Curated annotation (Swiss-Prot):
Gene3D superfamilies hit by this protein: Aldolase class I
Pathway: Amino-acid biosynthesis; L-tryptophan biosynthesis; L-tryptophan from chorismate: step 4/5
The reaction(s) this protein catalyses: 1-(2-carboxyphenylamino)-1-deoxy-D-ribulose 5-phosphate + H(+) = (1S,2R)-1-C-(indol-3-yl)glycerol 3-phosphate + CO2 + H2O
Keyword Amino-acid biosynthesis: yes
KW Oxidoreductase (keyword) present: no
PROSITE patterns in UniProt: IGPS
Alphabetical list of InterPro entries matching this protein: Aldolase_TIM (IPR013785), Indole-3-glycerol_P_synth (IPR045186), Indole-3-glycerol_P_synth_dom (IPR013798), Indole-3-GlycerolPSynthase_CS (IPR001468), RibuloseP-bd_barrel (IPR011060)
GO biological process: L-tryptophan biosynthetic process
Membrane spanning stretches: none
GO molecular function: indole-3-glycerol-phosphate synthase activity; phosphoribosylanthranilate isomerase activity
HAMAP family named in the record: IGPS_A
Protein name, entry field: Indole-3-glycerol phosphate synthase
Gene that encodes the chain: trpC
Length: 274
């Protein structure tokens, strides 16, 4: 069993138990008193490449636990991030839905990053202050339904893709925020070429977020040059001796990069994906 399969099985069991303790109807009732969330899409829309900075306590890909606290990193991110991703999966990433609630105090659009396997988690995200939810193609059972549920709750989901087929499925389902994860979720290996290969398939009217693999300003510049509208950066910032300095360097690297993607000719497309 792969690490992805283990995580999915774990999340399904945990959400089943959570929904017994707090039924979905009870979660829905909590939403009636909440203000509208900040717009995640607006935060990523502009004339420059946007940055989504991530808070996570651990990562199975590195086998490490990160010692920096949420509030320490939020103080850094509020000075340069356009939005913040908060990992809430607890068993493998040591995350918590409470981190999302605490991060919502900073007035920055938040992405709940998790392995979403049930609409219960979408309601949970909204109740905890999220502006967006990560929905992974092939993990969430009904992509179109998941997108619709997010929008009913005034959130725009980030739909994560790993292949050309994933992108076409996401577009067909109505996704407006397309994420390309440079990390293979089965092997945990990173390849920035994935964004370069898949970016031309994303229409200009949609926003493309390149996820994972930015270890420094050079990587950020490469991905921005591939046509990413936004970069999601986590591990390098969590590991940096001075995350503020690294964030400044990344901001400077992408400052002059304008969003925009090339298009494949028919021959180029078939050569790329043959």
């Amino acid at each position: 069993m792969s690490i992805l399969q283990e995580i999915i099985r774990s999340r399904k069991l945990e959400i089943k138990n959570l929904s017994r303790k707090k039924p979905l109807e009870e979660l829905r009732d909590e939403l009636t008193s909440l203000d509208e969330p900040l717009s995640f899409t607006d935060a990523l829309t502009g004339n420059r490449v946007s940055l989504i900075c991530e808070y996570k306590r651990a990562s199975p890909s590195s086998g490490r636990t990160y010692g920096r606290g949420l509030h320490e990193m939020m103080e850094v991110y509020r000075e340069g991030a356009d939005a913040v991703s908060v990992i809430t999966e607890n068993r493998y990433f040591h995350g918590s839905i409470e981190f999302l609630r605490e991060a919502s105090e900073y007035g920055i659009p938040l992405l709940m990053k998790d392995f979403v396997v049930d609409e219960y988690q979408i309601y949970q995200a909204r109740a905890s202050g999220a502006s967006s939810v990560l929905i992974i193609t092939g993990v969430f059972p009904d992509l179109e339904s998941g997108i619709e549920t997010c929008r009913e709750l005034s959130m725009e989901p980030l739909v994560e893709c790993h292949s050309a087929i994933d992108i076409y499925r996401a577009i067909e389902a109505g996704a407006e925020l397309i994420g390309v994860n440079n990390r293979n979720l089965e092997t945990l290996e990173v390849d920035l070429e994935r964004t370069r290969a898949l970016a031309p398939l994303v229409p200009d009217e949609l926003l493309l977020v390149s996820e994972s693999g930015v270890m420094g300003p050079e990587d950020a510049e490469i991905l921005a040059g591939c046509g990413a509208d936004a970069l999601l950066i986590g591990t390098s910032l969590m590991l940096a001796s001075d995350p503020r300095e690294l964030l400044d360097e990344i901001m400077a690297a992408v400052k002059s990069c304008k969003p925009g993607r090339k298009r494949y000719s028919g021959d180029e497309f078939f050569e790329q994906f043959a």
